[in-house]
Amino acid sequence: MCTGTALPGTGSFSIKYSIISEESFFKDVDWLEKNIQLLKVRASYGVVGSDVTSGNRYLYNQVYQTGDGYYFGDYPGQTPSYKEGDLGTPHVTWEKAKKFDVGLDMNLFDKISLTVDYFHDKRYDQLVSRGDIPVIIGIGHSPNNIAETINQGFDGQISYQDRFGNFDFNTNVVFSYAKNKVKYKAEAQQKYSWLAETGKPLNQPFGYKWVGYYTPEDIVKIQSGAKDAPAVPYTDIPVQAGDLKYADLNNDGTIDDFDKGAIGKPNLPSTTLGWSFGGYWKGFSFNVLFQGSFDYSFAINGTGIESFKSQFQPIHQKRWTQEKYEKGEGIEFPRLTSNPSTINSASTYMSDFWLINAW
């Protein structure tokens, strides 16, 4: 950390209240005292810091780099030169987070255990490169402590154990649900609101919105310059019937980067579940575990799905063809093409057509 920059203080506190051990009215009621072994509420709040950074740890330093040099005199000899590199961030500090948690713990009937927590994290002073500084300044700049994100949700587990004769068993369910959002990241002012990452979840994918396939009638309108012709991509490769068709979000008649918006869900599950079951009988024991993640999207591209990538898939049999279109058959894939730069390429034109949502 650079000289003169103070490290902000961090700390935390927690409180808990165990009703069973503190309240006499529980002990005065036999059923409660017998069947509820633990009933506790707790809460905590704290500010924590992190000095983990990626790459350069000396962001506060001004960087100078070797330049192209200059020729002096009559002989061809280049004299090295130096130029400014990325501007330093003199008051860089660690990233911080305000963490709040409230929870409930219960033990019932000497068999059931329950733990549930709600959490809310506000992360701020996150190190990111500013996107709102114009490149006209002619020099790079180091990351700044400017970004802010919110993460909140709940998690917990429920356990049950019992015995039947010589057979002991236990089962356990764990769960977690969390949502996050970018509050601020100093991104450049976007021409259209749907291009902004601020206000979206972390790792939100952006791309085109698929609205169907170009039809032979669409191609006729495009070639004739009809006013109601659908928008076409900004490329030298003309579209053909059976190509994927995307929404023209700004209604300018061209499919380009200005038509990219948030598609699908982040590739980070918001919900995770797990279930385990175990038993013991006369020296034999076993355990099984199932777990899953839900509420996220992932993209399929390349050899896994695109045509002529040496991986013929069953879905390619449901591709667009003139015959299928005329017969009104179900079509689930665009026309096959070996050109990797067409509008049908997931690498060149990423869209929600290529996304799979996990519940």
Name the predicted role of every residue range:
Residues 71-87:
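Surface-exposed acidic, glycine/proline-enriched linker/cap segments
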Residues 1-68, 84-86, 90-359:
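Outer/extracellular conduits and scaffolds centered on Gram-negative outer-membrane beta-barrels
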